[in-house]
Structure formats: structure tokens, C-alpha cells
Amino acid sequence: MKLQLGLLSTALLFASCATKSTAEQDIVSENFEFSASQLKHAFTEIDSARAHLTEKQIANNVFAPRNIEPDGSLRLVASRDWCSGFFPGELWYMYEYTGDDFWKEKAIEFTAPVEREKTNGGTHDMGFKVYCSFGNGYRLTGDSTYRDIMLESASTLITRYKDKVGCIRSWDHNKDKWQCPVIIDNMMNLELLFWAAKESGDSIYRDIAVNHALTTIKNHFRDDYSSYHVVDYDTITGDVLHKHTHQGYSHESAWSRGQAWGLYGYTMCYRETGREEFLDQAKHIVGYIFNSPTLPEDLVPYWDYNAPNIPDEPRDVSAAAVTACALYELSMYDKENATLHKDRADRILESLTKNYRASLNNDRGFLLLHSVGSGNSNSEVDVPIIYADYYFLEALLKKAKLEKEGTALL
């Protein structure tokens, strides 16, 4: 009798584990099934929007979806826009998950227009544009043409490095306001440089990326490990002139997507260098995010952790998606808290799936609703934005790979 009960208990345990594993995997497969239908709808929406482009817009290479405008229309942007690489990146992720050449051909089509950015020395967003598009394409196809474009892009990006400052300059605009602005977002563009160092054998790319990351640790973070958005430097002395926000609530507030950029960036920097200060920084940022008294129970933050009218403030789904991506990878390195990091990432994906997803064959083909571009300037507030979708698919891929292969690296 005892043996029978033991066998029954063991069977129930295995059944429970199998059910949980299947349920966890289902969130990935179901979301990719949804995304396949939704992105096919997006192609129709894009074609419709393209039909209304002016000759000037066509000449300026307007092609990629970015967000839904206040009037409900689909906004398409040119390759020079910092968001131009996310939609082709989504298509590469669809190809990676499905293996269907339909997505590969579409990814190739939407990646091609970004090539002209490889010589654009006026942008720091080369990683967002080129690594998300050509980077994923090269990883999945091995196309040597893509490799050459990426190396040229990396060479262009490092022309913005200011040796006296120890950082890559971010924006060129508002020169009456800033001398050498560096934004926390720029941590995300370092991955292209680490890749270029390995691919070319030239250490200059890695050295610049490491210097930028170290300088950012020194000057961007407060004592509680929340991050400023913009740090402005004197180009002659390298001294800090100002610490500001541009997209957050105030200069001393914690803009939620900025915290996510930092977390993702330092997790990636640890992967590429093995330097403990980068892992420590990522862990500190996690501590700030998840100890914030304003973080909602569903782990989808308000657009700024210090926004004045919480809980009556918009959420930023994009910040949650980026955070989930970082947590899956961080769980590989921070062994002591691995389960906690993964559980939090899983909870974020569950929240996004249940409560923030777009309606099928609606919402101009976007996957997620309720992101905020810049609450400070009332721009792209509580709307679908393309980078939320990109990092949502990335997080799903990382979850699937982590559970199947024990690694979140794509």
C-alpha cells in the first residue's frame, strides 16, 4: 500500500512538473503564433501607409513602423530614425523561432534600407539601427555582406568617442544646451562594438566600449543606483557639467526605461568582459527596480518611478520588456539569485501577455499596447511603440532557450 501511494505521489509530481513546463512553454508558442498573425496584418498596414507617403518621404527612405499617432494613423520612419532597426529585427526573431523562409525574406526586405546608416556619423544609435537588424541577420544567416556593413557601422560609431570624456557622444542637437551629452540609452549600442572587436581582432572597439561603460558607472548613477538620463560633459576638461533628464519626469527622477537600458547594458557588458564591476552594477540596478515602492504588482512600471500622480500615470510596457530580456540573461551569471531573476522575467511576460497585448488584426499590427516614448514632452504617451515589440519577442526567445538549453544567449 505504501509503495502504491509512493508511486502515485511520484506520478503526480512528474505530471505536475510536466504540466508546469508545458504551460511555461505555451506562453512562448502562443505568443509567436499571435505575433505571426499580427505581423502579417502589419504588412497590410505598412503598405497602406506607404501609399500615402509624399515623394520627399519616399526619397528620404521612409519605410519602418514606429508607433501609432494620436489620430490613430501608423507612423513610418526613415532609416535615420533611431527606431528603424527594430521592425526588421522582429522579423529576424520570427524567422529564428519558426524557421519559415517567409519571415527570412521579409526580414531581408526590411533590413536592406538600414544599410545607408553605416556611414552616418551623426548618430550614436548605430547599435539600435544596425545591430538589431543586420546583427540578427548575420547571426542567423552568416551573410558576409551583413558582416561588412556591421564592421563599417562600428567604425563609424567610434568616431563619436571623446577620449577626454571617456564616452561616446550621444546627441548632436541642442548644442546651446549641451556640450557632450551622454544618455543611459547609449549602453545598448556598446554590443555592436564588442562584436566588432571579436570579429575584426581590433581591440579599439572593445576598449572604447569598456571605457564608456566605466565612465557611465562613475557619473550616471545615484547612491541608490537609479540612473540619470543625460550627463553632459565638458569636451576640453572631461568634467561633468550637468545631470539632466530629457524623457523622464524630472532631473532627479528615475525614468523607467532608462533603468532598463542600464540593466540590459551592464548585463551584456559582463558577458563580454567578465568584469565583476559590471555584474555588480547590473545587480544594483535590479535592486533599485524591484525595491521601488512604486513598482506595480504586475511588474510593469509607470513611465517614471517618481512620476507625480502614481497610480494615475501611464505604464511603460517597453521598460518591462527590456527588463525581462536582461533578467533572463542575468540569471545565468548571478547564480545566487538565478531563480528569482527568471521568476521575475516570467512574471513580466505573463503580465504583458494577459493585460498589455494588442487585439488580433488590430492596432496597426503592433504586438503590445501602453508604452511611453517621452512623458516629459508628452510624446508617444500610452501608445504601441516598435521597440516594446522587439524586446518582447527577444524575451520570449531567451525564455525558450534558457528552459531548453540552459542559456539565454541568442
Regions found by a protein language model. Give the residues of each.
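Short, linear, compositionally biased motifs with a strong N-terminal bias
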Residues: 10-12
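Sec-dependent signal peptide recognition
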Residues: 2-8
